[in-house]
């Protein structure tokens, strides 16, 4: 059983590394970073407690929102649909008006720039 699981994982990694474009690998690395950050915050909440509850909520919800936005950008790039620059720009404008903290704007700008199709 473990040999088959190991072979599936090794085949997945080989195909992922050989066939996935660099742009999507970067988005996947960012998604992994956000996931680990959210898990770390949630683990800290379980172990230590939620004394400054508003701080925990803002950090955790920021991770969830960033994960959703980055996942959306990743799905846009993986699909066979053609997305125009106008649609990406409108997505960026919507993102700027929907996110109030200034530190969220560079993340959103990076995600919106990735949705332009091409090499």
Swiss-Prot record:
Compartments, as annotated in UniProt: Endoplasmic reticulum membrane
InterPro entries: DAD/Ost2
Residues carrying N-acetylserine: 2
Main location: endoplasmic reticulum
Any GO CC annotation of this UniProt entry: oligosaccharyltransferase complex
Biochemical pathway: Protein modification; protein glycosylation
Transmembrane regions listed in the UniProt entry: 31-51, 55-75, 82-98
Regions of this protein lying in the Cytoplasmic compartment: 2-30, 76-81
Keywords recorded for this protein, A-Z: Acetylation, Endoplasmic reticulum, Membrane, Transmembrane, Transmembrane helix
Source species, domain of life: Eukaryota
Subunit annotation: Component of the oligosaccharyltransferase (OST) complex. OST exists in two different complex forms which contain common core subunits RPN1, RPN2, OST48, OST4, DAD1 and TMEM258, either STT3A or STT3B as catalytic subunits, and form-specific accessory subunits. STT3A complex assembly occurs through the formation of 3 subcomplexes. Subcomplex 1 contains RPN1 and TMEM258, subcomplex 2 contains the STT3A-specific subunits STT3A, DC2/OSTC, and KCP2 as well as the core subunit OST4, and subcomplex 3 contains RPN2, DAD1, and OST48.
PANTHER family the UniProt entry points to: DOLICHYL-DIPHOSPHOOLIGOSACCHARIDE--PROTEIN GLYCOSYLTRANSFERASE SUBUNIT DAD1
Family: Belongs to the DAD/OST2 family.
Free-text function comment from the UniProt entry: Subunit of the oligosaccharyl transferase (OST) complex that catalyzes the initial transfer of a defined glycan (Glc(3)Man(9)GlcNAc(2) in eukaryotes) from the lipid carrier dolichol-pyrophosphate to an asparagine residue within an Asn-X-Ser/Thr consensus motif in nascent polypeptide chains, the first step in protein N-glycosylation. N-glycosylation occurs cotranslationally and the complex associates with the Sec61 complex at the channel-forming translocon complex that mediates protein translocation across the endoplasmic reticulum (ER). All subunits are required for a maximal enzyme activity.
Record-given protein name: Dolichyl-diphosphooligosaccharide--protein glycosyltransferase subunit DAD1
Taxon lineage: Eukaryota, Metazoa, Chordata, Craniata, Vertebrata
């Amino acid at each position: 059983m473990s040999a088959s699981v190991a072979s599936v994982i090794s085949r997945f990694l080989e195909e992922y590394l050989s066939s996935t474009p660099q742009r999507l690998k970067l988005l996947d690395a960012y998604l992994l970073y956000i996931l680990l950050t959210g898990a770390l915050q949630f683990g800290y909440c379980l172990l230590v407690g939620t004394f400054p509850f508003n701080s925990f909520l803002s950090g955790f919800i920021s991770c969830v929102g960033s994960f959703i936005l980055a996942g959306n950008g990743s799905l846009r790039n993986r699909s066979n649909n053609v997305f125009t620059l106008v649609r990406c720009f409108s997505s960026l404008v919507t993102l700027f008006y929907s996110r109030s903290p200034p530190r969220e704007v560079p993340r959103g700008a990076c995600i919106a720039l990735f949705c332009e199709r091409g090499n």
